[in-house]
Amino acid sequence: MFTKKSAGPILLGLLLTFATGAGAQEGGKSGRLTIEQLIEIKHPSDAVWSPDGKHVVFTWDRAGVANLYVANADGHGQPVELTSFAEGPVEEAFWGRDLQTVYFAHEGHLWRATIGGVGAKAAWTATTSSRESDFVLSPDGTRVAFVRSRASDEDAARKSTLIVRTLGDGSETVAAQDNVSIRRPIWSPDGASLAYAVGSRTINHDETPAYSGKKIIYRTWEYVPGQIFAVKIAGGKPVAIGSPVEYGGLAWVDATHLVYDGESKDFKKYSIYVANTAAGKPREIHSITEEQFWSIPDWGEAGAQPWPSPDGKWIAFLSDQDGWDHLYVMPSGGGEAVQITKGHFEAWRPTWSHDSTRIAFDANEPDRPGDRHIGIANLGGNPAHATVTYVTAGNGTNIEPHWSADDKYLVYQHTDTRNSADFFTIEAKGSAKPTRLSDSMPAGIDKSQFVEPQFVRFPGADGKPVPGWLFVPKNLDRTKKNPAIIWIHGDGVNQNYDGWHVQRNYAVYYSFHQYLLQQGYVVFAPDYRGSIGYGRDWRNGVYMDVGGKDAKDAWMSANYLKTLPYVDSDRIGVWGLSYGGFFTLIAMTDQPNLFRAGVDVAGVVDYVMYYSDPYHGGWTASRIGTPEQNPQVYANASPISHIDRLERPLLVLHGTSDVNVPYLESVWLIDEALKKGKGELLSYMMYPGEFHYFTRAHILLDAWHRVDDFFAFHLQGRIKDAH
């Protein structure tokens, strides 16, 4: 229980950190937000147009439970639920040729659901001893390619088969087999060939001691890049496509050529290659050499892979060679690359129109880095004469546009200060009005209670201005000194937005901060160096300095808050997830009396350990080299080495199935804290089976109430009445 002396002893296993119940109900006042309400906010993803442009199917996630929905593209009516699964992801959705059937992957098999039908069912009968994945529809819509492997994790990486199945009669053809896993098959434009990757392997993450006679084992698939094959469906031997680099994105240019990109082993050179699938030999058509390291987030986030036009004439890609992430286009056969977007902003996620004349993308603004808008580059047959038109405007974050089949409309995701992520459609021209497809906010939430952030800058570690977002509670008594909380975002290469975060993993934290604002806290969220949205130089500011000036930028937010007359400089808390948890640990040990209390959610405790895990070695080495090359840099990035300096209460939260930051890191932190006599300052909760980003409702409910209780006691001097 709480005492004046400490935050209470460490409690391992499933014991409650506090004597008070962490899952009790909050609120009750009219218009007041509750944790329970905020957990009900859903997050949409993976929108797919129907071929006739009348519908959009998408995944809607509620606290880790994902299901498939279909919406009318004109916005009429409410989205209709196509599936009702209680657990397990819903992925890789695509439409059938009848325009009524939607296929999707669920728990190792292909399923199908029908618009207007009842429930979903397996697309075909599959054995329980096998799992199927990586489903992709052929260009003519008659066949599906997928990977079949053994169902057990132990055997899955040993042998896999690339299958082509005809949807009409169910006949199957074996396209390729390998003794290691096959991944990411993609069809050639003519439907005659498949390209695929070979070479993922299992990494056994550190094992925990046995609890209650059981052992929890951490295991994840790590993709080993650089092994590409192409194969003719009608028969023939797979052709190995050579790659001088560890490749990233892969796409067909035409029926006989592939394009892919990759980075050199020292992470300084980025190259684009085109390979003839008959010969297998690649040719470099473009390269960029960086002084520090290539840092545009990978193809899954920024869309920073080469994107060939549907007609095969052009390749679009992203480059930061002028200091900002911009859209470029070059001939697919090689030649001069033309910069399409220009200015002090970042353009991401390009996508070609089906007629190859336009590219849609999203970009932020020079004076509003937390907003993003959908732009369209009209090439007019010549990239050198391209014109750019923006189709969205105003405050908010609009991302990830996708063209309808007739190229007349776009579907995209939108967030702002009153709305979490939702899908909208808009006509692909200027001055069009968007149409809302979904509403992810529960009806009982009073949106007028939400606090809009103010964009500010403050002096950082070396005097450079650090951007950040200040949230001041509504009706705050500014004549008094009030407690404050600093939130440090994770990933390093991420940012805060002008409203709800675009990613579900961070949107849940934005929601919780709206609750904390109603509890009377001023909240501040810095975009420390290393963050995206502010150009290459700011993003690369972590080079050979992880845990240095970037961490100082974060904890120096407290110095800024102290300049505000309504903030109590003695009642400032700090917390963060992942990279933000790492910074929290640095702040609590490097500046032991700056913060009254801190919360570390799955933070890295030592970068030597983090580097030694094969799942993270490349990311770490690109920024700070290896421990042998730069031992002092790694020593600075090791808050566990300074845990003896801890003077204020620290709450640590971590999921046991975390593969981003292995759970063992927090176990090691607790062990070292005990050895240094700091046990009475630490409170701890582990979440069985939870991943890095907390997703499940019961986990979020416990974690948010636990953090609420922790800050209420240490920053406000009270135990929550409702608990």
Stretches found by the model and what they are:
Residues M1-I10:
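Bacterial N-terminal signal peptides that target proteins for export
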Residues G27-P44, P79:
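A short helix->beta-strand "capping" segment at the edge of beta-propeller domains
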Residues E36-A66:
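Beta-strand-rich domains and repeat architectures in extracellular enzymes and scaffolds
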